[in-house]
């Protein structure tokens, strides 16, 4: 009996050894595959106004995706830290909250911190600053006009009787507060405004979707007393009425908001306001 057991063990040993060798080879192949470089190319808009004779051009960088985070901003930071420290762009929160890293990625305006890298290694990812804006350097647009327009709508609570300011709360019902959902979440990244053809051609007069959505946010706030005055400021032919419902703004918003709908609501409010004004 002992001889039979010994024979059985001897017969199994080669199979066991062979299985172990196969498993080890398989693990080795997986490790090799995991460590194989995954080189992704990024073509990035470059322009330095402080460099004499420099003209806007595209510069291509290569990044190993195995050594990079999943978002486009991760790749930009890696390029700046490890390849080219002169590359300039804005960024802050890295969580889709501040709006700093807004740029045009593969043809669409979005946030670099929330846009995942296209892992197709055969395609070059193209990155530009927000379109139709003056460029300060590389991927940094000049947002001075955008912020000035935002300031012009007085984006804060206004009361006609200020005697109670700081002495009591301005209460809202749940229903009144819910009217602000889909409006207050705007982070002023300018993705929507810079995707709007009407804003491209009339940016000096047309306020654009981002600013108009914020104007609407304060018009319908139950605590605000200046709705009619806010409407009166938009009566000219350009501030509001250059919107032609192209809806690029809604399609591109990285927060999933609907500026086009807000503008349509302002137009309806404006019609009622004008009727009321004419009847006086």
Swiss-Prot record:
Free-text cofactor note: Binds 1 [2Fe-2S] cluster.
Gene Ontology CC, one term: respiratory chain complex II (succinate dehydrogenase)
Enzymatic reactions: a quinone + succinate = fumarate + a quinol; (R)-malate + a quinone = enol-oxaloacetate + a quinol; (S)-malate + a quinone = enol-oxaloacetate + a quinol
Ligand binding ([4Fe-4S] cluster): 186, 189, 192, 253
Binding site for a ubiquinone: 201
Membrane topology term: Peripheral membrane protein
Modified sites of kind N6-acetyllysine: 51, 55
Pfam families: Fer2_3, Fer4_17
Cofactor(s) needed by this chain: [2Fe-2S] cluster; [3Fe-4S] cluster; [4Fe-4S] cluster
Pathway annotation: Carbohydrate metabolism; tricarboxylic acid cycle; fumarate from succinate (eukaryal route): step 1/1
NCBIfam families, sorted: dhsB, PRK05950.1
Family to which the UniProt record says this protein belongs: Belongs to the succinate dehydrogenase/fumarate reductase iron-sulfur protein family.
Subunit and partners: Component of complex II composed of four subunits: the flavoprotein (FP) SDHA, iron-sulfur protein (IP) SDHB, and a cytochrome b560 composed of SDHC and SDHD. Interacts with SDHAF1; the interaction is required for iron-sulfur cluster incorporation into SDHB. (Microbial infection) Interacts with JC virus small t antigen.
Related illness: Pheochromocytoma/paraganglioma syndrome 4: A form of pheochromocytoma/paraganglioma syndrome, a tumor predisposition syndrome characterized by the development of neuroendocrine tumors, usually in adulthood. Pheochromocytomas are catecholamine-producing tumors that arise from chromaffin cells in the adrenal medulla. Paragangliomas develop from sympathetic paraganglia in the thorax, abdomen, and pelvis, as well as from parasympathetic paraganglia in the head and neck. PPGL4 inheritance is autosomal dominant. Paraganglioma and gastric stromal sarcoma: Gastrointestinal stromal tumors may be sporadic or inherited in an autosomal dominant manner, alone or as a component of a syndrome associated with other tumors, such as in the context of neurofibromatosis type 1 (NF1). Patients have both gastrointestinal stromal tumors and paragangliomas. Susceptibility to the tumors was inherited in an apparently autosomal dominant manner, with incomplete penetrance.
Protein name: Succinate dehydrogenase [ubiquinone] iron-sulfur subunit, mitochondrial
């Amino acid at each position: 009996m002992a001889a039979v057991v010994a024979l059985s063990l001897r017969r199994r040993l080669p199979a066991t050894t062979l299985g172990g060798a196969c498993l080890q080879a398989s693990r080795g192949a997986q490790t090799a595959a995991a460590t194989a470089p995954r080189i992704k190319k990024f073509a990035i808009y470059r322009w330095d106004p402080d460099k004499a004779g420099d003209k806007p051009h595209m510069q291509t960088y290569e990044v190993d995706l195995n050594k990079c985070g999943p978002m486009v901003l991760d790749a930009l930071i890696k390029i700046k830290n490890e390849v080219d420290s002169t590359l300039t762009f804005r960024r802050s929160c890295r969580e889709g909250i501040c709006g700093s890293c807004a740029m045009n990625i593969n043809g669409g305006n979005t946030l670099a911190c929330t846009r995942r890298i296209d892992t197709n290694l055969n395609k070059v990812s193209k990155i530009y600053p927000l379109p139709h804006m003056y460029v300060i350097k590389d991927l940094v647009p000049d947002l001075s006009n955008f912020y000035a327009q935002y300031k012009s709508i007085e984006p804060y609570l206004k009361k006609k009787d200020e005697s109670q300011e700081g002495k009591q709360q301005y209460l809202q019902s749940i229903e009144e507060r819910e009217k602000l959902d889909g409006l207050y979440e705007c982070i002023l990244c300018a993705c929507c405004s810079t995707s709007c053809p009407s804003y491209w051609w009339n940016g000096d007069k047309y306020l654009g979707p981002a600013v108009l959505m914020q104007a609407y946010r304060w018009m319908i706030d139950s605590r605000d007393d200046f709705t009619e005055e806010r409407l009166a400021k938009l009566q000219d032919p350009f501030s509001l009425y250059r919107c032609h419902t192209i809806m690029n703004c809604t399609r591109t918003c990285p927060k999933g908001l609907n500026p086009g709908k807000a503008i349509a609501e302002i137009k309806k409010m404006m019609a009622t306001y004008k009727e009321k004004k004419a009847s006086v």
